[in-house]
Amino acid sequence: ADNPGDDGN
């Protein structure tokens, strides 16, 4: 699962 702080920008 992706971390909640990971915005992908």
Curated annotation (Swiss-Prot):
GO-annotated molecular function: lactoperoxidase activity; peroxidase activity
Keywords annotated in UniProt: Oxidoreductase, Peroxidase
Oxidoreductase recorded as keyword: yes
EC primary class: oxidoreductase
The enzyme's E.C. designation: 1.11.1.7
pH dependence: Optimum pH is 4.0.
Recorded catalytic activity of this chain's protein: 2 a phenolic donor + H2O2 = 2 a phenolic radical donor + 2 H2O
Superkingdom per UniProt: Eukaryota
UniProt temperature dependence: Optimum temperature is 70 degrees Celsius.
Record's keyword annotation contains Oxidoreductase: yes
The name this protein goes by in its record: Peroxidase
Organism taxonomic ancestry: Eukaryota, Fungi, Dikarya, Basidiomycota, Agaricomycotina
